[in-house]
Amino acid sequence: MFEKVLIPTDFSSHAKKVIECVGEIPGLCELLLLYVVARDPLARVWDPVAEVKEAEKRLMNEKNAIKTPGVNIRVKAVSVLDGEVASAIQKVAAEENASLVAMGARGKNLIQSVLLGSVSRNVLRFGDTHLLIMRYRMLESGDMEKYCARIFAKVLFPMDFSQPAEAALSFLKSMPGIGELVLLNVVSKGETRAEIDEGVKWAAEKLNEISQDLSKDGMKVTSRVVIGNPVEEIRFASDEEDVSLIAMSSQGSVAIKKGRIGSTAYDVANSADRPVLILRRSKIAMYYI
């Protein structure tokens, strides 16, 4: 599944924590640590070659500190103009044929916020590779350790019954290491109470069918149907269920025209308080039912 993982780092404590956690990713065979040297717009003199060499030395120190037996670890540093960091990450991910990009929600920026930093946000919006976003809010409160222990221990999967969501679920079904899967459908449309109730009934029946099918393969599955705003209800359910990860398709029943990510997936990834795995629609086409 995620045999080759790319981790962009800025050498912050948050980025180092992501590196420590990545060993729990199922099927990991190769790890590439990437540092992007961005030009300081205020600097009159810039020596990208020297900065890349210095970055490579620091990356080697990071590599030597990783204790993940059986995993091939490589390092890479590239230089770009300021503001092109996210593009550089995407380019390297494509060139290296990475199966997953794992990164923190924000880096060295000292402004405390639940929302994503600019680099993570741009990789989320414009990237084509599956993306795992680790949340730093948990690290600051000291609670991130439990998610590092087993990122896939309890996974919340929002299901809107769209083709991309079904493909993403099929992808998860074939992934080893998931302890428990929580299926969630949010009924957000209905002109009358009767329409809403009918939507809830239909969704509950569909989720029950899916749960029974997944349970046949030995997976522990629970499901729930709620009424409300999808983004708010997904965040609420993740807290109430105390999940270790939110996993969802990059696009659902309503997708941004010509975009790489739908509004619900974007808003959840941007504001969730725990790790979020975005499964790119373009990468899971083979799982379409």
Regions found by a protein language model. Name each.
Residues 179-244:
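Structured core of small recognition/catalytic domains
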Residues 1-17, 73, 125-170, 270-289:
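Intrinsically disordered or low-complexity boundary/linker segments at protein termini
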Residues 94-146:
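Hydrophobic alpha-helical segments and helix pairs
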Residues 103-126, 248-271, 285-289:
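Glycine-rich, Arg-bearing micro-motifs that act as flexible, cationic patches
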Residues 32-34, 74-79, 132, 182-184, ...:
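General small-molecule cofactor/ligand-binding pocket signal
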Residues 67-101, 140, 215-246, 254-255, ...:
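Structural beta-alpha unit
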Residues 1-50, 150-195, 212-216:
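Small/aliphatic-rich secondary-structure junction motif
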Residues 35, 105, 136, 185, ...:
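Short secondary-structure boundary segments
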